[in-house]
Regions:
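Helix-loop junctions and terminal segments of transmembrane helices
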Residues: 58-74, 147-148, 206-208, 265, ...
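Membrane-interface junctions at transmembrane-helix termini in multi-pass inner-membrane proteins
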Residues: 3, 7, 133-158, 176, ...
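C-terminal transmembrane helix end/exit motif
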Residues: 1-3, 100-104, 144-148, 152, ...
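Membrane-interface alpha-helices at helix entry/exit sites of multi-pass transporters
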Residues: 42, 77-90, 261, 296-305
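Alpha-helical transmembrane segments of multi-pass membrane transport and lipid-handling proteins
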Residues: 88-114, 128, 171-175, 300-356
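Interhelical loop/hinge segments that connect adjacent transmembrane helices in multipass membrane
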Residues: 1-6, 120, 181-182, 196-244, ...
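Hydrophobic alpha-helical transmembrane segments
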Residues: 17-19, 123, 127, 156-206, ...
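Signature of the first transmembrane helix
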Residues: 5-69, 99-103, 132, 166-167, ...
Length: 363
């Protein structure tokens, strides 16, 4: 069953990724030609700003997800209900924290980007982004349950349909109105709708669980979760410093146009890495399930295989990126004005390679 669920997760995720990445690429191209570097740059910058706020999540999602593996195997519904209730409460606290910090941080936005480079609608853009991330934390917690139960593939058809509709509507809006606020509003509405429908599906799928349990978590389970969160804090902080500070630094010390150019390289990198991460993320719950069964020897063997696989895949990817990044962007896609010199491209490739080698550890 474990292998079967992994295959289903990989196949469904791959199908979803192909469709959404193709449409997302088309949407990005139209975005660039209709709105230009300024809006592209501010979009990338705000994603990094809110990535900074997301550190407050502290790895709670991963820690709770790990704690769910064993009770799911043992069908301990009481413990599952208790964990999910704590998870819901924790994410409410995180959402409130991010909202407060986001409001405060807006006062210091000029520190990251010169006011002369900011779009005139920056106030509305900023708080629409903030609204989206806060609502996401309030509504998305149940997806960890179905992922830990190796049944994430059941959500993929719904996600594909809604993502296709969202991207097509956004493309149409950009072509007709050439305006950013409406584009963002469509994204927020879509995110809320997807989360509501997914929550309803998961609630029905696990109707035997109580998502508002009043039972207390066993002391030993508390210790395990706290230990995992403390261990994950360093990982979360490290991931942010490596992957989410680039746009902040570029915007502060160079300009918003360079952030826009950089974001195109990162988009391509993320599209390719999305296919690679499907392999690792789709087996995460299966690997956790294996650990929960106490098979340490088998777990170490699987880890060694994953580490070797990541080395081979990311080495090939690094060489490909180095050779193809600039020819693709400059000659085939959006023109040479969106290119970085090769020494910067090399830095992007090395950073991605080193991050990729950590994938089995993160898994």
């Amino acid at each position: 069953m474990r292998i079967e669920n992994s295959i289903k997760n990989i196949a469904s995720s791959l199908c979803s990724n192909i469709v959404t990445s193709l449409l997302g690429f088309i949407s990005r191209t139209i975005f660039i030609y209709t709105l230009g570097k300024s809006y592209l740059g501010i979009s990338a910058l705000l994603q990094s700003v809110f990535g900074l706020l997301a550190i407050s999540e502290l790895g709670i999602s991963t820690a709770i997800g790990f704690s769910l593996y064993k009770p799911l195997v043992e069908k301990n519904n009481k413990l599952i209900s208790t964990l999910m209730t704590i998870y819901k409460k924790a994410y409410r606290v995180i959402a409130t924290t991010i909202l407060i910090l986001g409001i405060i941080l807006y006062k210091y936005l000029d520190f990251f980007v010169d006011p002369s480079q900011q779009p005139k609608e920056i106030f509305y853009i900023y708080f629409m982004y903030l609204t989206n991330i806060v609502i996401g934390y309030l509504l998305s917690y149940k997806t960890t349950l179905i992922s830990s139960d190796q049944k994430g593939y059941k959500l993929i058809p719904l996600q594909i349909k809604l993502n296709i509709i969202t991207i097509l509507v956004q493309i149409g809006y950009l072509i007709i109105f050439k305006e950013y606020l409406g584009y963002l509003a469509i994204q927020i509405f879509s995110s809320i709708l997807i989360n509501i429908i997914q929550n309803r599906f998961i609630t029905n799928e696990y109707s035997y669980l109580n998502f508002s349990s009043k039972d207390k978590l066993p002391i030993e389970e508390k210790r395990i979760i706290i230990k995992n969160i403390l261990g994950l804090m360093a990982t979360k902080l490290g991931d942010f410093c490596v992957n989410s500070t680039d746009n902040l630094i570029i915007s502060k010390f160079v300009d918003l146009a360079s952030v826009a150019i950089y974001s195109n390289y990162i988009m391509i990198r993320n599209l390719v890495n999305g296919y690679i991460s499907i392999l690792f993320s789709s087996i995460t719950s299966s690997f956790g399930n294996l650990i929960a069964e106490g098979n340490e020897k088998k777990s170490l063997e699987i880890f060694d295989i994953l580490f070797l696989l990541s080395f081979i895949i990311y080495s090939f990817e690094a060489v490909s990126f180095l050779c193809l990044f600039n020819p693709f962007i400059g000659d085939l896609w959006i023109g040479k004005e969106y290119l970085f010199p090769m020494h910067i491209v090399l830095a992007i490739v090395i950073n991605n390679y080193l991050t990729g080698l950590r994938m089995p550890i993160i898994t």
